[in-house]
Design a protein with these regions (language model features):
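Glycine-enriched alpha-helix->loop->beta-strand junction motifs that scaffold or abut catalytic
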Residues: 171-177, 194-201, 243-245
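Tryptophan-anchored aromatic micro-motifs
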Residues: 333-352, 361-370, 375-377, 410-417, ...
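Contiguous, well-ordered beta-strand patches that form the walls/edges
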Residues: 369-408
Length: 446
């Protein structure tokens, strides 16, 4: 993703004549090689964009500047609004990026074709090897950093299915194992792509349905486009069936909110849920060589989401997204209604507990033999805490209880006035129980 990257601007100029030479002294002879660009040095954390990604379920992203045949380095950071970049950044230089596309910052004429881009990349590798062997008497900043970054994850934004094969072939020639980003049409060359054994990054930007209500416009729709529109949701299923290792990305989507919708559609079309989960968690973590994200285990970052149901079902919604231990509420959960009258037991002592008020703003009253106790209640479904003030008005002491709501009761642990820890429970009184108590009270009154 290009999230949070402050893009450098091209210098203004009105020259219409072709530019053949580099504009940068001390760098590689071709300005479309931007190996010296470091994403971490050009950051502009965008809270609005971060919120959109969190709502889709993301907590950690790999950001880079997708500009140039060598686009520089990317960083790994979290979508954590509450802290600074110093805390958000997990790795400031995690990857080196390549594409077949020219840089928008340069007007240099070469390369002007896909074939030219491939030739330039090959020339770069040869020049880098020559430079590393001490072949140059002068310093070349681009070749210097390109060689330094060879130990990083090498990500090639290839795009089209055929370009995946082209990128892999370049990698084979120079002994580079690229992680290759595709375009979502990999199923059309699945046999060749499978043989590459490359790890892919796959977008799920399914094409919109064509409007064929106008007969004239309908005739302009190409059959191959219609066929791809029909087959696109099967792409992830086909990749999984052929044991292609891949992660998923929001790249190429007009709106990040379409990510979950399209992913659920892919699952509906046969993409296994366990494969989908791995493509969102463990596989991206392995691509980034990070062992403290992607799984929930002791020592890992507290990054996880809370969902109302199965994440891959359309009726489910993301309710919370926790990032580096910070809670982000996506959809406010309506707390369950625990109002009513309870029989409260603390250790072996019985009390009457009444929970009243509005849902989300409850109040509690506790009494014993008609003696009322000062009570403060906090309820954060399913957790409940109660502070009960002692009957002694001179030497005030407290009983502190906390616990969970279950289907049948409220229960947990209590700290008594003397510091002793005991169990407690509160069982909701039925209407029948209340009636019986009233009858007993009436008889006593008679």
């Amino acid at each position: 993703t290009e999230f949070g990257i402050q893009k450098p601007q091209r210098k203004s100029g009105n020259s219409r004549s072709p530019q053949y030479d580099t504009e940068r002294n001390g760098y590689y002879w071709n300005d479309h090689i931007r190996a010296d660009f470091n994403a971490y040095e050009n950051l502009n954390y965008d809270e609005k964009a971060a919120k959109e990604l969190r709502e889709t379920g993301f907590g950690t992203v790999l950001s880079f500047n997708n500009d140039g045949i060598v686009a520089g380095t990317g960083l790994l950071w979290t979508l954590n609004d509450t802290d600074t970049n110093g805390f958000r950044i997990l790795n400031n230089k995690i990857s080196q990026h390549l594409t077949f596309k020219r840089s928008s910052l340069s007007g240099q004429a070469y390369p002007s074709s896909l074939m030219g881009s491939m030739a330039l990349i090959k020339q770069l590798y040869h020049d880098a090897k020559w430079y590393a062997a001490g072949g140059s008497k002068t310093k070349d900043i681009s070749l210097d950093v390109f060689n330094q970054n060879k130990n990083l994850v090498q990500i090639f934004n290839a795009g089209d299915k055929l370009n995946i094969l082209r990128a892999d072939k370049i990698g084979d020639e120079f002994g580079i194992n690229y992680v290759i980003k595709g375009s979502g049409n990999e199923l059309e060359r699945i046999e060749e792509i499978k043989k590459t054994n490359a790890t892919l990054i796959v977008p799920i930007n399914f094409p919109d349905a064509y409007d064929v209500s106008d007969s004239f416009l309908a005739e302009q729709v190409v059959l191959s486009d219609m066929k791809f529109w029909n087959q696109a949701p099967y792409n992830l299923k086909v990749l999984a069936e052929n044991n292609v290792n891949f992660a998923l990305t929001t790249a190429d989507l007009k709106n990040p909110k379409d990510f979950l919708t399209n992913l659920r559609k892919a699952v509906e079309y046969g993409f296994p849920k366990e494969k989908a989960l791995a493509a969102l968690t463990e596989i991206p973590a392995k691509i980034a060589n990070q062992n403290n994200i992607g799984t929930l285990k002791k020592g890992n970052l507290a990054n996880f989401i809370i969902v109302s149901g199965d994440i891959f079902e359309s009726k489910s919604s993301i309710q919370e997204n926790w990032i580096q231990g910070n809670r982000n509420i996506i959809e406010k959960i309506q707390p369950s209604d625990i109002r009513g009258k309870y029989e409260l037991t603390i250790d072996s002592n019985k009390y009457d507990l009444s929970i009243e008020g509005e849902i989300g703003k409850i109040e509690a009253k506790i009494s014993q033999n008609k003696t009322e106790f000062g009570t403060k209640v906090t309820y954060n479904d399913p957790w409940i805490t109660l502070v009960i003030k002692s009957k002694d008005t001179i030497d005030s002491k407290f009983i502190r209880i906390s616990g969970l709501k279950s289907d049948t009761e409220l229960a947990g642990k209590a700290i008594l006035e003397n510091g002793k820890e005991v169990s407690w429970s509160a069982v909701k009184k039925t209407e029948t129980t209340e009636i019986k108590k009233d009858i007993v009270a009436e008889k006593k009154g008679d």
